[in-house]
């Protein structure tokens, strides 16, 4: 089986739009006919609940998978996958015990950064996903380090606000540190999120990010749109909940850009 392309939505700044981005990227890729495995790497479980998976994953979840990858001789990553109601979309959900994972990973001695990589390798032996899309927690901790080591591309959503652009240099350093271990890791791009171009600070914020990251900002920006919060409240992905909303269409456009960055051809949209 082929190894999937692993896309990780990351930013240590809380509320920058990681889970919203991951939730929409998954459906937009699935709409194009790709098989997608979403993995919720955040103990807040926001991505899992968006897909109605709040009650799932008591036994099968990312916490168990990472503990078992170390402990079970016949570890089979595919056993931790749950099916969703959405075509082409499967999941590994988060669990509240994920809070324990940071210390648990610290305590494991050998190959401390390779646990998530081993999980993906194990899944690739039996399953055929085109993409894995990770949502991550708002830290620069050991779990995120493991996820970066297992990734091909990091996609960084940045909230278009003063707080959103302040202190972003740290994620760049974190990326550089990780790429010493994972030479294959690339920055897929920066997504400006919650953009309101009528506000003058929006343009300033975009300039600040351009100065810091250069030309890796995606052309497509995600506007402030109440349908994002509404769909999350209703525990449904934005792209099926409000398929014609402004943000949904922007996430689709963004996904086309992501596909061109990762070198996969855009497929005919199946609606
Ligand atoms: N385009 C948008 N328009 C309006 N609200 C948005 C938009 N994108 C995200 N939000 C809202 O902003 C909040 C933060 O977004 P989200 O949960 O995706 O960020 P996050 O980076 O995953 O946060 P955390 O760091 O806590 O995991 C949520 O309440 C979400 O509904
Ligand atoms: Mg989140």
Residue ranges and their predicted role:
Residues 1-271:
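P-loop NTP-binding core
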